[in-house]
């Protein structure tokens, strides 16, 4: 670190992304990307927007993309703001609404803590129960902004809309942000509640269910006044946050919703199959409602499982945190990838069919 670094940031602990392999080929099950390609319409959008157009700035308001998303989730365009991934929407919310502080679970998306530290926010950590479920009453009347990942990461646990609504009702003077990065895997969104509660902000991403992690597309949904707040901040820091090609691809992804719904059904089916196989090998875990499983084995530390799988050509996500150090988060890949993973785990745990 240089001597010129702002003292406010010298102790900052940046977010640590999942490993991106560069020197060999792995089956990559560590960052919850879709194992399937984008829809044909999206692929065509990427090839159609030729190099000549790249000399022009993208639409800073992302009007076409906002309109498409609004139609898909059945709200007015004024209730939607497309962003450069849902992480941008989350950061803008932290900037806009956490003057009194921020609250989130002890085991959740690690970027929340990074954003809180980056913006020097008064942070309250809400401990989850022993089974990693959230006690809704722990989020009542906190006097600060609340952010909840639903389904949660890395646990995959899901809170039904009536539970979320109860939390919103008990925090009428502060914004409640619901991060729905994994909502498409068989769960119900709370976006319809934005018409009932002016303090509800919902974020989603195109990185998981829509096979567009590399395009960096997300959005925020909320009361028109909340969206105006976020737009004011966005346009004060990075008005051209979504590239031309990403905006075109995002519109096509929304139009090709049936293609992505089928992929989500396929991923959920593979997730359930994978969990049955892992239980047969002695693993236990949460009842995940996302595109990953969160599991541990009684005889092998989580770090050992992750390392042995890496040696066999698989990348999964191990978190070096005391409470979850025995667990690993494993992204659901294709059927063939998960069959190969289960076979590798049979060998690691001593359940090899040939032994």
Model-derived segments and their meaning:
Residues 61, 199-279, 283-286:
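PLP-dependent aminotransferase class I/II
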Residues 128-184:
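Active-site phosphate-binding strand-loop segment of PLP-dependent enzymes
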Residues 162, 308-312, 317, 321-355:
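PLP-dependent enzyme catalytic core of the Aspartate aminotransferase-like
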Residues 95-149:
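PLP-dependent aminotransferase-like
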Residues 76-80, 101, 180, 198-199, ...:
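Short acidic capping loops at alpha-helix termini that bridge into adjacent secondary structure
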Residues 63-101, 119, 299:
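Phosphate-binding glycine-rich loop
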Residues 268, 280-312, 328:
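Conserved PLP-binding catalytic core of the aspartate aminotransferase-like
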Residues 1-56, 142:
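N-terminal "arm"/small-domain region of PLP-dependent enzymes with the aminotransferase-like
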């Amino acid at each position: 670190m240089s001597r010129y670094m702002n003292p406010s940031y010298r102790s900052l602990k940046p977010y640590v992304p999942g490993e991106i392999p560069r020197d060999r080929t792995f089956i990559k099950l560590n960052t919850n990307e879709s194992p399937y390609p984008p829809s044909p319409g999206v692929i065509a959008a990427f090839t159609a927007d030729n190099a000549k157009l790249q000399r022009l700035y993208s639409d800073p308001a992302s009007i076409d993309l906002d309109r498409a998303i609004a139609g898909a989730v059945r709200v007015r365009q004024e209730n939607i703001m497309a962003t450069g991934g849902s992480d941008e929407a989350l950061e803008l919310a932290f900037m806009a609404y956490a003057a009194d502080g921020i609250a989130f679970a002890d085991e959740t998306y690690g970027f929340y803590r990074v954003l809180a530290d980056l913006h020097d926010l008064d942070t309250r950590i809400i401990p989850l129960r022993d089974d990693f479920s959230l006690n809704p009453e722990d989020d009542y009347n906190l006097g600060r902004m609340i952010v909840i990942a639903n389904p949660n990461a890395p646990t995959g646990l899901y809170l039904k809309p009536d539970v979320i609504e109860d939390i919103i009702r008990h925090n009428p003077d502060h914004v409640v942000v619901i991060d729905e990065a994994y909502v498409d895997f068989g769960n119900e969104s709370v976006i319809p509640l934005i018409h009932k509660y002016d303090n509800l902000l919902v974020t989603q991403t195109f990185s998981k269910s829509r096979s567009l992690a590399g395009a960096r597309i997300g959005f925020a949904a909320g009361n028109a006044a909340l969206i105006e707040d976020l737009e004011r901040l966005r346009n004060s820091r990075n008005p051209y946050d979504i590239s031309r090609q990403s905006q075109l691809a995002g519109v096509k992804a929304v139009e090709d919703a049936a293609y992505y719904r089928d992929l989500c059904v396929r991923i959920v089916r593979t997730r359930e199959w994978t969990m049955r196989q892992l239980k047969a090998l002695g693993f236990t875990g949460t009842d995940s409602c996302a595109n990953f499983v969160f599991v541990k084995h009684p005889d092998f530390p989580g770090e050992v499982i992750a390392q042995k799988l890496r040696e066999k050509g698989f990348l999964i996500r191990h978190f070096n945190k005391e409470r979850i150090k025995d667990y690993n988060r494993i992204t659901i890949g294709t059927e063939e990838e998960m069959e190969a993973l289960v076979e590798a785990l049979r060998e690691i745990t001593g359940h090899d069919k040939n032994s």
